[in-house]
Amino acid sequence: MTRKYLMIAAGGTGGHMFPAQALAEAMLRKGWRVRLSTDARGARYTGGFPHTTEISQVSSATFARGGILAKAMVAPRIAAGIAATAWEMRRDRPDVVVGFGGYPSIPALGAATLLRLPRMIHEQNGVLGRVNQLFARRVACVACGVWPTDLPEGAQGVHVGNPVRAAVLERAGAAYIPPGPYPMSILVMGGSQGARILSDVVPGAIAALPEELRQYIRVAHQARDEDGARVTEFYAAHGIDAEVQPFFHDVPRRMSEAQLVISRAGASSVADISVIGRPSILIPFAAATGDHQTANARALTGANAAILIPERALDSAALAEQIAAVLTHPDAALQMANAALSTGAPDATERLVGLVEQLAEKETP
């Protein structure tokens, strides 16, 4: 009996790739054949995918980077990617195509639309990304990570939550150790690509904490390559025990051991925080399309599980005050951790799997 075949299309950031990885893990366990279609940027994140996942790098591009010449080449490169993917799909037909957003998902979704293959998209944020907005009315359904999600007229939305990787599910609801007079961990995440503003502000905020509190703090700080040296030097100069890396491959473990998470409000980060259950201070990316990171944070802040600081209000003094507020009130910190758990959707992957299986049995749209 021929195995069913799922093609997953996802862009080159952790926000798109981590939920795609979660679906790949689940469908492989169910005996499906799984292929990931992405570009060179996305290929950097494939190390976490199960080794049985087939990987295809496609021709794609984005209007967000490069000069006039680079932008002029975007449409031809995407068109070439669609043509090549359509040719491949005619020879090797997927039962379902699922897009997770980002420009590299255009070739697979575009080809599936041309060939009228069963297809759907997953939107991680409370506001549709540009690519998902393009396809929202051209797919069987939009699986939504945040609810409500602003959808165009005619799009069929279904709330599933944001799938998290198996390594996160293994630590779902991990026991929380409230802050106290013993070593305490702070995890600083700027999304999969780091965030300069966190590298500018967080070290100074931790240095500004009273010595009787600061002496117990251990920091794991994700910083961009170009910021790593100065951030490391700052922590060392102020006697702060810190590990600084451009990317942590063991975020679930570090998060489960943390007393506090300081993070952007990307969909995957918020999902991990909710499923593991940790107090957090969230700084939404101000330039995010449709201010979607503020929308992502709404469930956590509404449950009093997170403190939200807009970028315009962020400085070391303000952040230090909020860090101290969490780490000097253990009972309140424990309440925040429990409240975070109440917003999580650890069954999001199962819900998404159900939609994929239903779509595989339906008539081609």
Curated annotation (Swiss-Prot):
Binding site for UDP-N-acetyl-alpha-D-glucosamine: 13-15, 125, 165, 192, 293
A GO-annotated cellular component: plasma membrane
GO process terms (BP): carbohydrate metabolic process; cell division; cell wall organization; lipid glycosylation; peptidoglycan biosynthetic process; regulation of cell shape
InterPro entries in alphabetical order: GlcNAc_MurG, Glyco_trans_28_C, GlycoTrans_28_N
Broad EC category: transferase
Swiss-Prot/TrEMBL catalytic activity: di-trans,octa-cis-undecaprenyl diphospho-N-acetyl-alpha-D-muramoyl-L-alanyl-D-glutamyl-meso-2,6-diaminopimeloyl-D-alanyl-D-alanine + UDP-N-acetyl-alpha-D-glucosamine = di-trans,octa-cis-undecaprenyl diphospho-[N-acetyl-alpha-D-glucosaminyl-(1->4)]-N-acetyl-alpha-D-muramoyl-L-alanyl-D-glutamyl-meso-2,6-diaminopimeloyl-D-alanyl-D-alanine + UDP + H(+)
Main localization of the protein described in the UniProt heading: membrane
Keyword Cell membrane: yes
E.C. numbers: 2.4.1.227
Pathway connected to this protein: Cell wall biogenesis; peptidoglycan biosynthesis
One Gene Ontology term of the molecular function aspect: UDP-N-acetyl-D-glucosamine:N-acetylmuramoyl-L-alanyl-D-glutamyl-meso-2,6-diaminopimelyl-D-alanyl-D-alanine-diphosphoundecaprenol 4-beta-N-acetylglucosaminlytransferase activity
Gene3D superfamilies hit by this protein: Glycogen Phosphorylase B (3.40.50.2000)
SS bond list: none
Function: Cell wall formation. Catalyzes the transfer of a GlcNAc subunit on undecaprenyl-pyrophosphoryl-MurNAc-pentapeptide (lipid intermediate I) to form undecaprenyl-pyrophosphoryl-MurNAc-(pentapeptide)GlcNAc (lipid intermediate II).
Protein family (similarity comment): Belongs to the glycosyltransferase 28 family. MurG subfamily.
PANTHER family linked: GLYCOSYLTRANSFERASE, UDP-N-ACETYLGLUCOSAMINE--N-ACETYLMURAMYL-(PENTAPEPTIDE) PYROPHOSPHORYL-UNDECAPRENOL N-ACETYLGLUCOSAMINE TRANSFERASE 1
UniProt name for this protein: UDP-N-acetylglucosamine--N-acetylmuramyl-(pentapeptide) pyrophosphoryl-undecaprenol N-acetylglucosamine transferase
Species assigned in the record: Ruegeria pomeroyi (strain ATCC 700808 / DSM 15171 / DSS-3) (Silicibacter pomeroyi)
